[in-house]
Amino acid sequence: MSKNKNGIHLSRRTVLASGLALGAGAFMPMARAMGPIKVAGIHGSPVENAWNSVLHKALQDAAAEGAIEYVFSEGVSGTDYPRAMSEYAEQGAKLIIGETFPVEKQARTVAADYPETAFVMGSSGTFSGDNFGTFGTWNFDGAYLAGMLAGKMTKSNIVGSVGAIPIPEVNMLINAFAAGVKAVNPDAKHLTSFIGTFFDPPKAREAGLAQIDAGADILFGERIGTADAAKERGIKSVGSLIDYTSRYPDTVFANALWNFRPILNAAIADVVAGKPVGRDYTSYGLMKEGGSDITYVKGVAPADIEAEMESIRAQIKAGTFDVPQNMDEPT
């Protein structure tokens, strides 16, 4: 870990060896022929944060396979974010991956200043021009399925969700979990709390404890730290984005997973082929595209609801069942 002259933390991963396929893979011969492209990751939170860790791992894996050279900054504040984008563009990054939720307008302005650099960002807005693409974190399919399990497991008939900020993506994820609960248990009550930031595990824990005090006996942790409250009070919890089961073996029984690699593969392929990245890459992260899923500990929920959930899961993957997409702030 080092600092550049402006104080932004930089870590470097440069791996030139190749030989492993990338999964989507069609662009790998081209990537090998022209050499790895330089990709920068700008993380608004530490890479230990669940969302950032998913991006970080996908980028590290692509570097280990020889498709890219990966450099990154973490914990970049909103005020520093546009500057970090400019710096990486000036340093020759061909593709910049990150998140522009707090700086939507400023990020697009920076991208317009560097038309030869591709920017693909987690965003609540739309793509812009030829070089600014967007993606959403749409693991709501897995959240809905986990909600089905939770709806049949709750004994108090109250479940809770702890989220970051009520932006459309977070709202949709929490609403999907609640919809899954209601699909199998219409009388269940769903509590929602937002902690006002993307990374503050102690604050998420406190929000979870408050929901438990209000009667919730299962928590959905859109934010890391929620499971700490569940563990402390001896109740069950659902994780999001990554698999928390090994970290909380007696607490987290299901996880709504999200895989950034299909989105990254598509973006790299476009850059290598010289195609514009000014498009929406969100669909590559859907369950039916292999970009998200659910993992759960079998036998924790009743067998009949596991079977019902698996039936819906198969329908989602086949494209015959659509989980409702509700981006309104949960009430």
Spans of model-derived segments:
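Short beta-strand elements in bilobed, periplasmic/extracellular small-molecule ligand-binding domains
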Residues: G66-E74, D187-F198
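Extracytoplasmic "Venus flytrap"
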Residues: K38-A62, V71-Y81, F101, P166-N171
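C-terminal segment of N-terminal export signals and the immediately downstream linker at the start
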Residues: F27-I42
